[in-house]
């Protein structure tokens, strides 16, 4: 998985993985990043890594207006090829 950390293989060829935010997605909303259209992955969670108490530690099932920050981690679902394409971007 290149830059991705494989968390769980759901079925043959499909996994849930944690990846760093690609540079092209930092400081964009999920709608602006358009990851599903560009790579086919589904973002299940945005995990916040900073200690800022004003930001939640995790955004479960994020919506199109949820912001992606450079220091976040994305928990995504997709095929190995889709996840590799996304994690190779960053």
Residue ranges and their predicted role:
Residues 1-27:
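Flexible, Lys/Arg-rich cytosolic regulatory linkers and terminal tails that connect or flank
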């Amino acid at each position: 998985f290149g830059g991705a950390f494989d968390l769980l293989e759901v079925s043959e060829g499909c996994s849930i993985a944690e990846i760093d935010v690609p540079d092209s997605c930092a400081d964009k909303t999920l709608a602006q990043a358009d990851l599903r259209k560009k790579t086919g992955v589904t973002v299940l969670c945005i995990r916040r890594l900073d200690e800022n108490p004003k930001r939640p530690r995790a955004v479960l099932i994020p919506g199109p207006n949820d912001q992606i920050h450079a220091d976040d981690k994305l928990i995504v679902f997709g095929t190995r090829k889709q996840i590799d394409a996304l994690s190779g971007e960053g």
